[in-house]
Amino acid sequence: MCIRDRFLQAVREVFETIQPVVEKHPEYEKAGVLERIVEPERVVKFRVAWTDDEGKVQVNRGYRVQFNSAIGPYKGGLRFHPTVNEGVIKFLGFEQILKNSLTTLPMGGGKGGSDFNPKGRSDAEVMRFCQAFMTELCRHIGQFTDVPAGDINVGGREIGYLFGQYKRIRDEYSGVLTGKGLEFGGSLARTEATGYGVCYYTQEALRVLKNDSFEGKTVVVSGSGNVAIYACLLYTSDAAD
């Protein structure tokens, strides 16, 4: 399925789900709420020029889709992967609106990244790319505007490089990026948090909806990234009983 089809499918599924609510509230249609939700408030595209270890200038594309800030600053990760393009980021940003709103925290939805492939690159090359990326991105983000995080290929190392460049340019030490190391403002157990959340959410759903628990059950986990790995660790521990 192409990324445009994925975006349209996600929009269609959301609209089908909320259709009964919309039918009871014609004022939503009059205000164009649905049309506004599916159109990003802002799409930022920029060139990222950086120098590799051979002294050659490389050029990548950078993106930040600031989808919706109705309930708070844009919030969503940065992804570095060769498959990244505007369509991918738009699809992920739309999903981020809904995920963030479900937390009940005042966070809007956004997503960003680049088609840069860190695989096979040295630490110095990754650092120079991150610095060049943030040099362009920094004018569009801020603790009250847009707070990026990590995603695929953007972990603690990359967040550190990005945050360092942000501080250098903006001359401020603020909560503009999540996923930082504990040494400079990061949160304890952030790496495990999403995977653990899957366990606790499923555990609570079983209890509330089925009056049941994990005891005696086989759990199937899809994937092998940070979310899946830490979900498996908690599922197989005594804490999941």
Q: Which positions does each model-derived feature cover?
A:
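A generic "cationic amphipathic patch" detector
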Residues: 68, 102, 211, 232, ...
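N-terminal ligand-binding/catalytic initiation module
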Residues: 4-188, 192, 201
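Glycine-rich phosphate/diphosphate-binding loop of Rossmann-like nucleotide-binding domains
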Residues: 192, 196-237
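Conserved small/polar residues in nucleotide/adenosyl-binding loops
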Residues: 1-5, 235-241
